[in-house]
Each structure stands twice: as C-alpha cells, then as structure tokens.
C-alpha cells in the first residue's frame, strides 16, 4: 500500500463561537478526499448522532391530538408541539435497562408555563429552559406524563404509535382519564453542518486539499463530541469491509520529512525578529522558540495561537515579512487569511486598544 502524507485535525479558534458552534479543519488531504470525507461526515452528523427525545405523552382528559383542553389557551396539538421542542442532556445509565424515562408534570398555576417549570428528574436535565409550553387560564390546570427514549435521526408520530404498542404496560401513568398520544421525535442534536474545501497548493503538481467542517448543535452535546461520535460510526461500518483493527496507522501515513528537516534547521533565536514582549511570549508559550519555526507557520496556524490579539498578529506578520525579504525566503503563502480573520477575533489582548 502506497503511503500518504499524515493529516492533522484541529479546531479553528478564529471561527469558534462556543463549544456548541465551531469549525474543524482537516488537512492536508489528497485531491478529492476533502469532498469524500466531508460528505460522509456531514450526512452522519445530521442523521446518526444519538440523543434523547419524547415519543409519547398522556395528558389528563385528552383523548386525541385535535382536542381542545379546558382552561388552556393551546389545543392538544399545539401543546404537544411545544413540548416536543424541549431538549435534554441525559445520563446513559437511566436508559440502560429499558431505554425509557418518564417525566410527570402537574400544575394549576395561572399564566404562562415554560420548560423551567418542569420538576427535575434524576439523570435528565433540560437545556432550553425558556421553551414555552402553555398558557393556563384562571381556574385551569395542566397534568401530563411525558415518555422519552434514546434514538437517532427523526421518527414521525406514525412510527411512534408502533413504539408505544411495543412498550405496552411499561408505559405506566397515574393519569386515569386520557389516551397515550404519539409524538414526532427529533433525536438529532446537530442543528447545522456545513462543509467547504479548498486547494492548498494549486501551483504544485501534487495538489492537496483542506476540509473545513462547521457544526452547530442544540447544546445537548458539544460539536467536538458530535464529530467524534460520527467518526466512530463511520469506522464501525468500514470495519466490516477491512481488517481495520489490525491496520497500523504507520502503514498508511508516511513521516512528515519536511517538518523533521525544518526542526533540525531551527537554530536562530526568536529574539532576532525584534517582536514585542507580548508577541514573543505568546509564541514561546505555543512552543515556537526560533525564527525558522515562525517562518514555517501558515497564516491559519498563526491565527490559532492562544492569547494572540489583533495587534500582536499584525506585529508578527510585519516582522516575519521583513525577515523574509532580508533572506529571500519564499514559501508561496499569502497573508490574505490573516487579514480576513483578524476581523473575526473577538478576544483581543488585555491592554491592547
């Protein structure tokens, strides 16, 4: 098997909003692999990440979903739709035995009811506590038992009718008047997933690509957890085709000789660049101690260094370019990415105005 260049996987700090909305970069990939990997990861992320969702509900005195509810502004179908939008973080242990959890709710409080009014259940935590549920009129009340299970993707209420039948008597409820109503279940915690790719060295005969994956979740799992779970699902499928357990990564990926050579030649102290104290310290903390290492940094790698604000990045770019001109250094890179990404940096250095 011909070896391919080692790839790197990292989070793009310049485009990170929070742990639930961020971008990952995979590079360098052989030509065509960015599209191939990106497509399968995106489809898996949107369809196959495990979460929990309601699938059935029993509301006091409600026989069918089109029924009006006395003392409530909402009818049954609107109430169910509102409850369906509640998102949960869960403990795996409570679903190990029967893949079933129940939440009981009862109130006669007048006014608007939100997810935050639902009592806490061991092993379950509501993420979107501001989710609106219903508006109770004076003298009215609301009582329901909500049933949840683990799953993947989207299951409509018709299919959940069969799920209710399968659970049978295990769906225990103290509510005497009313029927079990099936609900649509949206298990997927990934709200958005976008992929993009670009060529790294279009002027070279050996064209390589960079894959960017932007993920936004519903806050029940982090974007990093979601992409890791997607990768495990994909690998599990390919294990059937090839003996992956016995495949050593060293057999597939070649050593990065270029990086090794650069490390050997890295002898000029970073102080020779004449950077500000703040810029130099940030580079040293990131383990860049020589001029050669700084010159070898791509624009994207530079923008991802922790504690580098806008002014520090500009300082490094200027000093780096001056040094390159002096020694005739040419790496074929441009500073376009840095110029664009500086506007995206929200965390400028302390004390820099």
Curated annotation (Swiss-Prot):
Alpha C-terminal domain (alpha-CTD), as annotated region: 261-353
Q: What does this protein do?
A: DNA-dependent RNA polymerase catalyzes the transcription of DNA into RNA using the four ribonucleoside triphosphates as substrates.
For this protein, what reaction is catalysed?
Answer: RNA(n) + a ribonucleoside 5'-triphosphate = RNA(n+1) + diphosphate
Q: Where is this region: Alpha N-terminal domain (alpha-NTD)?
A: 1-245
What's the name of the protein? DNA-directed RNA polymerase subunit alpha
The record's family statement is: Belongs to the RNA polymerase alpha chain family.
Quaternary organization? Homodimer. The RNAP catalytic core consists of 2 alpha, 1 beta, 1 beta' and 1 omega subunit. When a sigma factor is associated with the core the holoenzyme is formed, which can initiate transcription.
Q: Can you name the source organism?
A: Mycoplasma sp
An example of a GO molecular function for this protein is: protein dimerization activity
Q: What UniProt keywords are attached to this protein's entry?
A: DNA-directed RNA polymerase, Nucleotidyltransferase, Transcription, Transferase
**Gene3D superfamilies, per this entry?**
5' to 3' exonuclease, C-terminal subdomain, DNA-directed RNA polymerase, insert domain, RNA polymerase, RBP11-like subunit
């Amino acid at each position: 098997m011909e070896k391919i260049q080692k790839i790197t996987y990292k989070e793009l700090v310049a485009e990170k909003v929070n742990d639930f909305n961020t971008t990952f970069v995979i590079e360098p990939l052989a030509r065509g692999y960015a599209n191939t990997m990106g497509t399968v990861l995106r489809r898996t992320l949107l369809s196959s990440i495990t979460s929990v969702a309601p699938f059935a509900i029993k509301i006091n005195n409600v026989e069918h979903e089109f029924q009006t509810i006395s003392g409530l502004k909402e009818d049954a179908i609107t109430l169910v739709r509102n409850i369906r939008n509640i998102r949960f973080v869960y403990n795996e242990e409570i679903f190990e035995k029967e893949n079933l959890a129940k939440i009981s709710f009862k109130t006669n409080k007048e006014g608007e009811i939100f997810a935050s009014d639902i009592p806490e259940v061991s092993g379950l935590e509501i993420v979107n506590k501001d989710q609106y549920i219903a508006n109770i009129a004076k003298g009215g009340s609301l009582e329901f038992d909500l049933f949840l299970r683990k799953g993947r993707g989207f299951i409509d209420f018709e299919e959940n009718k069969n799920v209710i039948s399968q659970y049978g008597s295990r769906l225990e409820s103290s509510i005497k008047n009313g029927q079990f109503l099936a609900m649509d279940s949206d298990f997927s915690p990934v709200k958005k997933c976008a992929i993009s790719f670009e060529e790294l060295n279009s002027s070279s005969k050996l064209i390589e690509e960079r894959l960017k994956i932007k993920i936004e979740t519903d806050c029940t799992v982090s974007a990093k957890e979601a992409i890791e779970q997607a990768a495990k699902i994909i690998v599990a499928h390919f294990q059937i085709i090839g003996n992956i357990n016995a495949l050593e990564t060293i057999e597939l990926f070649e050593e990065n000789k270029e990086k090794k050579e650069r490390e050997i030649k890295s002898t000029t102290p970073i102080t020779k660049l004449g950077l500000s104290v703040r810029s130099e310290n940030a580079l040293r903390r990131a383990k860049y101690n020589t001029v050669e290492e700084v010159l070898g940094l791509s624009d994207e790698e530079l923008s991802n260094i922790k504690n580098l604000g806008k002014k520090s990045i500009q300082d490094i770019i200027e000093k780096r370019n001056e040094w390159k001109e002096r020694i005739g250094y040419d790496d074929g890179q441009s500073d376009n990415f840095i110029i664009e990404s500086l506007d995206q940096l929200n965390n400028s250095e302390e004390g820099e105005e």
